[in-house]
Amino acid sequence: MSTNITFHASALTRSERTELRNQRGLTIWLTGLSASGKSTLAVELEHQLVRDRRVHAYRLDGDNIRFGLNKDLGFSEADRNENIRRIAEVAKLFADSNSIAITSFISPYRKDRDTARQLHEVATPGEETGLPFVEVYVDVPVEVAEQRDPKGLYKKAREGVIKEFTGISAPYEAPANPEVHVKNYELPVQDAVKQIIDYLDTKGYLPAKKE
């Protein structure tokens, strides 16, 4: 960590922001194998939250981020760790501004996801509580993901063209206790998104739906 720095707290508390914006900030963290459907769910989830529930939500997509913020990172374990660390920090900033951050990253290592959770749940200076962190396990068997393979990545991994590919030559550590477990090989997209939104409603994270 850098030295000789000071954290400057806002003049607004999080509760004041929540009251003024009529919205709680949180992060929805979608994790799962490549081709599990994370990005597809994230796109539809963002669409429904913004269009139907009238809340501020924004996607942070695993591929999109590597076009800019994380374009300097590869796919070694160290780079994957740094990839997730950066995204966790960015997602927290969105959540702290009372927006809903929707991240869709393979995030294969449990310790990295746990670190992202802790980053949110530990209160920052000037705040009494942390931020909600909703882990969504987008679950498909590797055989199903490999059959889908829209980018041809599994084929390249099997051929040895791609090294350290999650699910083939690198591990994926499934969440032990995710807030939402979506079996994305059984459900249509709309039903999977409904499962996530129903959880958010149950926890009181969303304002009441406007008729």
UniProtKB/Swiss-Prot annotation:
Superkingdom per UniProt: Eukaryota
PANTHER family reported for this sequence: BIFUNCTIONAL 3'-PHOSPHOADENOSINE 5'-PHOSPHOSULFATE SYNTHASE, PAPS SYNTHETASE, ISOFORM D
Pathway: Sulfur metabolism; hydrogen sulfide biosynthesis; sulfite from sulfate: step 2/3
Organism: Penicillium chrysogenum (Penicillium notatum)
UniProt similarity note: Belongs to the APS kinase family.
Purpose: Catalyzes the synthesis of activated sulfate.
Subunit structure: Homodimer.
Record: active site: 107
Protein name: Adenylyl-sulfate kinase
